[in-house]
Amino acid sequence: MRVDIKEKLYSGKPALRDIRVNFPRGKATLIIGTSGAGKSTLIKCMIGTTSYEGTVTEYNREEIAYIPQHPALNVRETAQEAIYWSALFSRLYSKDALAAEVDRYIHTMGLQSVRDNEIRRLSGGQQQRVSIAKELIRGKNIIIADEIDTGLDCGVSRDLVSKLCSITRKENKTTIIISHNIVNIELYDRVVVLVKSSSKCGGIAYAGSPKQIRSFFEVDDYVDILTRVNAADEGGRGEADYFIRKFASYRERQGKK
Amino acid sequence: MVDFIDYIRRWVSTKASNLLGNTIMTAAIITVTCYAVQKDVFESYSATKACLFSVLMCCIWCGLFNSIALFYSERDYLLDDLDKYLPVRTYVSANFFIQFFLSAVESVVCAFVFSLFFDFSSSGYIMGNRSLDFCVTFFLITLSADMLGFLMGMLINSITSIMTIIPVILISQLLLSGCLFDLHGVMEDAANITTARWGFYALGSIADLNSLLMPGQELSIFHADPAYIMYCWRYLFLLILICSLLSGIMLYFKMNRVEN
């Protein structure tokens, strides 16, 4: 999936500018960024629910599975039923294969012990796993997950991301995860850092491997990345503009090579 | 058609208890209402008119409650399902089928309770039995209000806002029914697109309200003849159709909207 957004305006004001980034198949990408940097807007552009100037290519809208921040589930259904109905309506499986596929995804997402529990009885992390299984079973190639680890403890969050990343590699999917949780950064194949410039417009401050991100931002601790790019009135050092420029010239050098 | 059947199966598997809950609530509301207004019904004009008006408002309330309660209880995951795999037309038709069934069950309950409380002639104008005539009218009123509630659900995004709107809908139905006072001009025109007006006219005609008036008095709105009752029913049917179609169109645009 190749995103090239020249500009996205909201009420005449730019919300995103010069967003050029690739999301390769078989890789899990983390989109991390400061508040108001346009992460959700970027997702809306990718799934086609908002207009923008630019192009999103090498994908098919029908191939996207979107996992919302708050699981949209019928709380009266059991975990197994929720996954079953999603699989059934996808019309991908024969009657015989359906039960086996539901079973497979229940195992993949570690839901065996709660498969017959009503969703309202599940914890937030378990509900999120049901929500992911519901999307995975529909066989889509591009998975976009919007802050799915918000409100979960670090262990549950790590387990969730780890499962999603491993499925991405095993099943050759394109996975894009928006998250505020930077502690799991090493689990991903790629990281995109979206920041809010001094003119309040979202731009890319980094896109690449998580291995080089600390040296790019000249920090020892991942958390300090956000401290450097956050605005001064948000407790940061207000260096977003500097890193947008730094990344633009880095990308230019890479292009020339 | 496969999606339609699967949607109904899925709905029944988790929401069938709603049918029972709504039916019990309807039975309770209609019983309390009939008990409260039972004196002199089908003997005096004003008592009968007040009774029919009360029952009419009960049916409107039950219809509105059916769709609004159901839609907002499943709104979040429903919109997600509609976005991902459930075609809008499948949902709209399946929802119509469910509400049709729910309204039918509730009208039977209403007609049953109504006939237990009141003693009226058994000969009907359209169905051969007056209880059945009442039952069909209750059904059309309930379903019409139900579809109006569904349309409101499409127009209004939050349960808080809809709770503010419901009293406005009920009061406007109450005022425009023509029961409390005569309407003229714009109000008269507005009344023609309300469930309350046509429901009230149909009920009044089936109850033969004119026959309870003093000799020499006659109101032009209640005509105890099959053609007039059919005329009122057709209007109710038209309201059902319009609200259903508008709901479908609204939902389609809601799901396919691209913001700027």
Task: Describe each model-derived feature in a short phrase.
Chain A
Residues 1-4, 11-12, 101, 115, ...:
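Topological signature of polytopic alpha-helical transporters
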Residues 135-136:
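ABC ATPase C-loop
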Residues 32-34:
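The feature captures the beta-strand-to-loop junction immediately N-terminal to the Walker
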Residues 147-149:
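Walker B catalytic motif
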Residues 97-114:
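Conserved ABC ATPase "signature" region
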Residues 70, 75-92, 101:
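Q-loop/switch helix immediately C-terminal to the Walker
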